[in-house]
């Protein structure tokens, strides 16, 4: 589930669908969703008598910061995370622009706090000066079992990955 103005719904060239999934959209406001809209969407989904025959909302997607340059506040992210926890749906934070979000004067979230406000996020490297790489962070007990074979099967496991690691140590 993503905001209709969110990156994954508009600017990912169908990457989610290419992998066999579907992006379900709710109203978006400059790239952001509101917790109330998310709760209403999920409530309506379960009230539908034939919900078992429709696409199940399997994750919630937000960007920090959005392509519009907007930021989620700690309170907004906490409210969305609360809906996700209540409904047992993981919250994924797209952190392609996370370095810029965390550096913004308006941002009231720290990196450790972000880890408490979602289930998985990633830290984009290339948009903040790295030559390549993104770091996926699984929070709490949400890490998948045996991730390396899955990464390798998708052609995303870099040889000499230590070179990528060094950049993240320097940047974050």
Task: Pin down the residues of each PLM region.
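Alpha-helical scaffolding segments of alpha/beta enzyme cores, especially the outer helices
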Residues: 40, 75-86, 109, 113-116
């Amino acid at each position: 589930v993503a905001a209709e103005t969110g990156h994954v719904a508009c600017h990912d060239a169908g990457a989610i669908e290419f992998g066999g999934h579907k992006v379900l959209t709710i109203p978006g406001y400059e790239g952001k969703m509101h917790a109330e809209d998310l709760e209403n969407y999920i409530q309506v989904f379960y009230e539908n008598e034939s919900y078992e025959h429709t696409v199940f909302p399997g994750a919630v997607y937000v960007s920090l910061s959005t392509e519009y340059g907007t930021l989620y506040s700690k309170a907004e992210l906490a409210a969305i995370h609360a809906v996700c926890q209540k409904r047992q749906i993981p919250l994924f934070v797209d952190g392609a622009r996370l370095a810029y979000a965390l550096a913004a004067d308006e941002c009231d979230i720290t990196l450790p706090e972000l880890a408490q406000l979602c289930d998985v996020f990633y830290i984009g490297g290339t948009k903040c000066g790295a030559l390549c790489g993104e770091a996926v962070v699984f929070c709490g007990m949400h890490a998948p079992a045996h991730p390396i074979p899955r990464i390798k099967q998708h052609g995303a496991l870099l040889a000499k990955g230590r070179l990528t690691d060094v950049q993240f140590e320097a940047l974050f």
